[in-house]
Regions:
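Boundary-proximal intrinsically disordered activation/regulatory segments immediately upstream
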Residues: 1-65
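Glycine-rich nucleotide phosphate-binding loop and flanking beta-alpha elements
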Residues: 43-44, 64, 86, 105-107
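Glycine/small-residue-rich loop that forms an oxyanion/phosphate-binding "nest" at active or ligand-binding sites
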Residues: 66, 70-102
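Short, exposed beta-strand "edge-strand" segments with a Pro/Gly-rich flavor and a Y/T-containing core
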Residues: 33-36, 52-54, 73-80, 104-105
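Short secondary-structure boundary/capping segments
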Residues: 26-27, 34, 69-70, 88-91, ...
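Short, glycine- and charge-enriched coil/turn segments that flank and shape catalytic ligand pockets
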Residues: 50, 62-76, 107-109
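RNA substrate-binding interface of SAM-dependent RNA methyltransferases
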Residues: 2-3, 48, 100-109
């Protein structure tokens, strides 16, 4: 069973700041070795390929409705206040959930 979800309500939270960089700055993915994938369709695709995300991130309203479906998907679940999730998303219409996956290491020559 995964640990309880971590709830974040402040934009000053360091994890929120890190997630926002990852979601909005393409260079951050390369620097951090992780990628932000937004939307339940991408989370379902990861699950179908047996990819276990490092983080699953939910808007609070989404978590209240779908925690039972997603609770075991990632190693850690993060629940953001709805306005924070909207600020995190680079999409015009935020999907209300996303995942962070570890990127494979580049092949060595």
């Amino acid at each position: 069973m995964p640990p309880p979800a971590q709830h974040i309500h402040s934009p000053a939270n360091p994890l929120f700041k890190d997630l926002r960089r990852l979601a909005q700055d393409s260079a951050a993915s390369r620097k951090q070795g992780r990628a932000w994938l937004e939307g339940d369709h991408l989370a379902r695709a990861a699950r179908a390929r047996q990819v276990r995300p490092a983080l699953a991130v939910f808007a609070e309203s989404s978590w209240q409705q779908s925690a039972h479906e997603w609770a075991g998907l990632a190693r850690q679940n993060i629940v953001l206040a709805d306005p924070l999730f909207a600020a995190l998303s680079a999409l015009p219409s935020p999907a209300r959930m996303g995942i962070v996956i570890e990127l494979p290491l580049p092949a060595q020559p």
